[in-house]
UniProtKB/Swiss-Prot annotation:
Pfam family membership, one: MJ1316
Protein name: UPF0248 protein MK0350
Family: Belongs to the UPF0248 family.
InterPro entries given in the database record: MJ1316, UPF0248
HAMAP family: UPF0248
Domain of life (superkingdom): Archaea
Species, as recorded: Methanopyrus kandleri (strain AV19 / DSM 6324 / JCM 9639 / NBRC 100938)
Length: 74
């Protein structure tokens, strides 16, 4: 998403655990992410540990979810 110039970061939505919100989750749009460094998603105003990521969607479809096995794996 960040390194492929043909990929549009705004198509991605990343859901992270957020202890400060009433729902316990925070939604981050891909174009908010400036970089990924040392296990953190770097936003313009925050750094979020990657271990808090629970789901990634692209174009409204789930492409990764914590605890979900990748397709084709047994």
């Amino acid at each position: 998403m960040l390194h492929d110039p043909n990929d549009d970061p705004s198509e991605y939505v990343i859901y992270v655990i957020d202890r400060g919100s009433s729902s316990g989750l925070r939604r981050i749009w891909g174009d908010e992410i400036q970089d990924v460094k040392r296990g953190f998603l770097v936003l313009w105003n925050a750094e979020i540990p990657v271990h808090r990521v629970i789901r990634v969607e692209r174009g409204g479809r789930v492409i990764w979810e914590r605890g979900r096995r990748a397709r084709g794996r047994r």
